[in-house]
Design a protein with these regions (language model features):
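N-terminal targeting leaders that direct proteins to extracytoplasmic destinations
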Residues: 1-66
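Compositionally biased, intrinsically disordered low-complexity regions enriched in proline and serine
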Residues: 3-7, 12-13, 78, 100, ...
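Second-shell loop/turn segments in exported
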Residues: 23, 30-38, 75-89, 127-131
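Periplasmic peptidoglycan-binding/anchoring modules of Gram-negative envelope and division proteins
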Residues: 41-63, 77, 81-118, 146-148, ...
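Extracellular/periplasmic catalytic domains that process cell-envelope and extracellular macromolecules
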Residues: 61-63, 69, 109, 151, ...
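A short acidic, often aromatic-flanked loop/helix-cap motif at beta-alpha or helix-coil junctions
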Residues: 67-68, 166
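Periplasmic OmpA-like peptidoglycan-binding domain that tethers envelope proteins to the cell wall
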Residues: 82-89, 113-191
């Protein structure tokens, strides 16, 4: 079950929106409602970018259109494992010190409804195994967040995607290292 809807039919200022993650279908929203949603999206993404910069997290990349932050599995996990490495815990501590205040504030202000932690793998190995590994890794990160920030426990969802949505290099070939990742995404509140 996915708690968010990708809607690529909404128009903002006459331009087609990017894959916007919201907790409802935005196709029936008024222009004013869409404008407010876009303002919320911009405010949260800008807040996260500023917080990441302050924490020295230049490697944290946020997709402003979807609210997705991508993390490097090579830092978080050993090969073929779902247990956080010590380096991964240190990275998450630094990441969460920047992420949580911004997202908690956005939740309190009614801008964000959900945090989705998604795991991905490369295409090496069995598809069913990869799906299970991606779910376990996403769950491990979600559990780590909940342990440090129990106030977020009720807004975190976990999704394993296995080898879906592979990252491709410049030649159109799979970038296996980049494909092995965990992403954290905020979902905009529409109601």
């Amino acid at each position: 079950w996915y708690p968010y809807v990708y809607d690529s039919t909404a128009y903002w200022n006459g331009e087609l929106s990017d894959n916007l993650a919201t907790d409802a279908d935005v196709s029936s929203m008024s222009e004013q409602e869409l404008g407010e949603l876009k303002e919320n999206q911009t405010a949260v993404s800008s807040g996260l970018m500023g917080a990441f910069k302050e924490q020295g997290l230049d490697s944290a990349k946020i997709d402003e259109s979807t609210g997705t932050v991508q993390m490097d599995n090579n830092v978080l996990f050993a090969w073929d494992k779902a247990d956080l490495s010590e380096e991964g815990k240190a990275y998450l501590d630094q990441f969460l010190a920047a992420y949580v205040p911004v997202i908690s504030g956005a939740i309190e202000e009614g801008k964000v409804s959900t945090i989705v932690v998604e795991g991905y793998t490369d295409s090496a190995g069995d598809e069913a195994y990869n799906l299970k590994l991606s779910e376990e890794r996403a769950q491990t990160v979600a559990d780590y967040i909940k342990a440090g920030y129990p106030e977020l426990a009720n807004v975190i969802e976990v999704v394993g995607n296995g080898e879906n949505n592979l990252i491709l290099n410049g030649e159109g070939q799979e970038d296996a290292a980049a494909s092995r990742r965990v992403e954290v995404r905020y979902v905009l509140k529409t109601e």
